[in-house]
Amino acid sequence: MLFDQIASNKRKTWILLLVFFLLLALVGYAVGYLFIRSGLGGLVIALIIGFIYALSMIFQSTEIVMSMNGAREVDEQTAPDLYHVVEDMALVAQIPMPRIFIIDDPALNAFATGSNPQNAAVAATSGLLAIMNREELEAVMGHEVSHIRNYDIRISTIAVALASAITMLSSMAGRMMWWGGAGRRRSDDDRDGNGLEIIMLVVSLLAIVLAPLAATLVQLAISRQREFLADASSVELTRNPQGMINALDKLDNSKPMSRHVDDASSALYINDPKKGGGFQKLFYTHPPISERIERLKQM
């Protein structure tokens, strides 16, 4: 079952790439149509930007993601307890030792990133290290090491890269519209135009506004299922389901992270770092912790 999931994750990598590049193409066409009067030109530029961004994330994902999240690298001398727990989990999972980082934040959280097990890294918050006992820390690190072993990190890295590129393009277009300029000129050109031009204008505006939301929804669909698998895989590594249950219970009671976490990075964490209420619950990057605990109790 586990090897089937790993193979499935590799297939999903290509599907994910296709979906995100289609979204990039849509945003690029919209930006080009509105601001340079060439939808095709905007599409080509957007795809080039997305391709370069994705490649840079794949080859430098650890440095980029850790920098985005304010993490600092540690070793056996500076964080011996965390180092030895990660070392044990990596040994059991039969993967190379990942690099280790700490995020100075009182909230309880952790994540893994990288393009493959040979270039992976894990990060934990200072709050998690202060609150979790040894068994709970093993469970959390087992969860993150499982993401590495199951090749979830490659999917996550690509998702972060392309979602960030889509958000960047949409944000840039929004600022250009706010400033006026080309957007106003396009509106003036289309004021006396035919119905098709008006429809294209509306569709382009909607694409710019909705593409970041669509990218987030794609991340949600992928992230939620792999969290269940990583929880179960952690129990497989530690042979201690109660440790994972206790860790999840503490994570559930943790406050949101005090530092800003961008939307693209949120899906990486073991616990949703924002924990908004009301309408925001619809866009949680993780399944409810109560549901995750219930699944573990049924193992």
Curated annotation (Swiss-Prot):
Catalytic site positions: E144
Keywords: Cell membrane, Hydrolase, Membrane, Metal-binding, Metalloprotease, Protease, Transmembrane, Transmembrane helix, Zinc
Record: residues binding Zn(2+): H143, H147, E227
Pfam families: Peptidase_M48 (PF01435)
EC number: 3.4.24.-
InterPro entries: HtpX_protease, Pept_M48_protease_HtpX, Peptidase_M48
Cofactor(s) essential for the protein: Zn(2+)
Molecular function GO labels: metalloendopeptidase activity; zinc ion binding
Annotated GO biological process: proteolysis
Cystine pairs: none
GO cellular component, one term: plasma membrane
Signal sequence annotation: none
Main location: membrane
Transmembrane segments: 15-35, 39-59, 158-178, 198-218
Subcellular location: Cell membrane
Cofactor binding remark: Binds 1 zinc ion per subunit.
PANTHER family recorded: PROTEASE HTPX (PTHR43221:SF1)
HAMAP family found in the cross-reference section: Pept_M48_protease_HtpX
Similarity section: Belongs to the peptidase M48B family.
Entry protein name: Protease HtpX homolog
